[in-house]
Design a protein with these regions (language model features):
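Acidic beta-to-alpha connecting loop that harbors the catalytic carboxylate
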Residues: 17, 211-213, 237-239
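Conserved HGGG/HGGXW glycine-rich cap/lid loop of the alpha/beta-hydrolase fold
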Residues: 8-61
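Short beta-strand/loop motif that positions the catalytic acidic residue
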Residues: 201, 207-209
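Flexible "cap/lid" loop of the alpha/beta hydrolase fold
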Residues: 101-106, 111-145
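Conserved alpha/beta-hydrolase "acid-adjacent" motif
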Residues: 214-219
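Conserved alpha/beta-hydrolase catalytic His-Asp/Glu region
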Residues: 122-130, 140-199
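Catalytic active-site module of serine/aspartate enzymes centered on a nucleophile-bearing elbow/loop
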Residues: 230-260
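Active-site loop/oxyanion-hole signature of alpha/beta-hydrolase fold enzymes
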Residues: 37-44, 50-91, 95, 252
Length: 260
């Protein structure tokens, strides 16, 4: 399904019964809406699900230039308006987590519960430099040189070495991500900070991450402690793309939190 919103055309998928609570899934950098296939299958009987390729990803348009999270948040609200979605729950991972943190701060009235996964919630000078290096590689040589370094960062070593099915799925998504989209969203990731204002968020929040997601795992524990009433689930034997490393555990925790 193609939806025009905020000046570009988004690729979207809608499933689940009409009249059920809306649940929006938001993808990570260099993936597309199909990263959520296991969760869509598990929850589509209980929720009206919107999955969309974020700006510059999958089959959504990929304008040139550097994007910001303000822009990515505006995209979501424009999509919701175009589809007459008054209010929805949110589940986002990595870049989708940061987008959700921005929405929780800018548009809390448009959302019910937030499930925020595998992100530190802010950039640092070091991570900013790393993103700029990756941007330079993509502009010079395309996405191919970024595939293996990315999957090695994202997946636990034993999962990567075994070449588990989810690794190949993600390899293909990274390789086929439009360069404009990668560059635009990587620029947003290089310069953002949603940590400072998260303690003021009133919506119910579940933080969820893999136990092997490096600094993001530690950051999620800190953010849970800083936001009164929020919950934390750490998935065992899971890395950055925790919903694919532990799909059944992830879907169960997601469903239980959204149904509380």
């Amino acid at each position: 399904m193609k939806i025009k919103a905020n000046g570009i055309t988004f690729n979207c998928d809608i499933s689940g019964p009409e009249g059920a609570p809306w649940l929006i899934f938001s993808n990570s950098l260099a993936t597309d809406l199909h990263m959520w296939d296991p969760q869509e299958t598990a929850l589509k009987d209980r929720f009206r699900i919107l999955r969309h390729d974020q700006r510059g990803h999958g089959a959504t348009e990929a304008p040139a230039g550097r994007y910001t999270f303000d822009l990515l948040c505006d995209d979501v609200i424009a999509l919701m308006d175009a589809l007459n979605i008054g209010k929805a729950h949110w589940c986002g991972l990595s870049m989708g987590c940061a987008t959700g943190m921005g929405l929780a701060q800018k548009h809390p009235d448009r959302f019910g519960r937030f499930v925020l996964c595998d992100s530190s919630g802010r950039s640092s000078p070091e991570s900013g430099r790393q993103w700029e290096d990756r941007i330079a590689i993509a502009l010079k040589d395309g996405m191919a040189p970024l595939v293996e370094p990315t999957v090695q960062r994202w997946f636990p070593p034993e999962v990567y070495k075994a070449n588990a099915p989810q690794v190949d799925i993600i390899r293909t998504m990274i390789r086929t991500t439009p360069v404009n989209g990668f560059v635009g969203c990587a620029a947003a990731l290089a310069d953002h900070d949603f940590r400072k204002l998260m303690p003021s968020v009133k919506n119910p929040v579940l933080w969820m991450c893999g136990d092997q997601d490096g600094p993001n795992t530690a950051a999620m524990k800190v953010m849970q402690g800083e936001l009164p009433g929020s919950q934390l689930v750490v998935l065992p034997n899971a890395g950055h793309i925790s919903n694919l490393d532990q799909p059944a555990m992830f879907s169960k925790a997601l469903a239980e939190f959204l149904s509380a």
